[in-house]
Amino acid sequence: METRPFVPWEQMNAFMIDVFKAYGVPEEDARICADVLLESDRRGIESHGCNRFKPIYIDRIVNGTLLPVTKIDIVKETPTTVVMDANNGMGMVASHRMMELLIEKARTYGMAGGAIFNSTHYGIAGYWTTMAEKAGMIGISGTNARPSVAPTFGVEPMMGTNPLTFTMPTDEDFPFNFDCATSTVQNGKIEYYERSGKPTPAGLVITKDGGTMTDSGAILKEMRKGNCALLPLGGLGESTGGYKGYGFTTIVEILSAALAGGPYMKALSGKNPDGTNRMYRLGHFFFVINPEFFMGLDTFKTTAGGILRDLRASEKAPGEERIYTAGEKEHLAWLERKDKGVPVGESIQKELVELRNKWNLPYHFSFED
């Protein structure tokens, strides 16, 4: 049972827009950024929602590693491809423009692909692929990130958590939406554990001596020093398939950097050798596929829906009541939350009040009663 107070969706949306604007983000861009963060909370992905509003976006605008005004330059374009320079502006704004371009290209040519460099955190990858799904198409996206994941048989943080996302239309009430990091856990989840006062489960982090860590705050601190790292999907070594996750992480790293000729791995740390801040210069990639250029959208949706229904109807393991398919839990989270709002713990409450008071914004939150 949820015990945290809720902030209504409309109020949180308006508040974040006003705060973004106060820090110099143009209103149209602020609306995009607020919606991306709220969509994460709508889906129950709290590691990438309002939990990150201040530390990942506002604080980075303040420290100069994220520019509030996004100057987008298209450095190369063909009928089916786009390469975009985000010039260290809002990654969410550049990604929104990219998906608009690719969807229109895919309407005409059936497929389209794009790459962005010199970017910043773009929120949940599934937001961009869902833009394609809402247009009746298939969306694929991934991004690199600051180094935090060790290669199989290694202990040094080399690559980011590098999410890989696929969203596909179905004939059900929700799409197939597979959106996950290619590591055992994402940084945002550990940040969420730390802010909630919870430990990180054992076995997700490897230390220099091959051990593990569970203190969430210590993990975040030591990872930035290079003293521990996250493990790729599959975990430690090869016996449980860690090399497979390592492969997926590497695929995302290559596509995120090489398609646009951008930086990679240690160059994305956001820190200079002397410890001072610098731009993150992240890279993202996007692909859009139009089913109408194959056997048609209706055929695709019916077949996809049939596959998902057969999976959910298959024999369950002892003690399990339900089999889920990707995107289903996010849909259920929205049904649970749509009339309530965004759940906010104590740390987020403090940040909301701090930002409101700093800019003298006319908001009163229910948790203050």
PLM regions and their residue ranges:
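Active-site cofactor/substrate anionic-group-binding motifs, chiefly glycine-
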Residues: 48-103
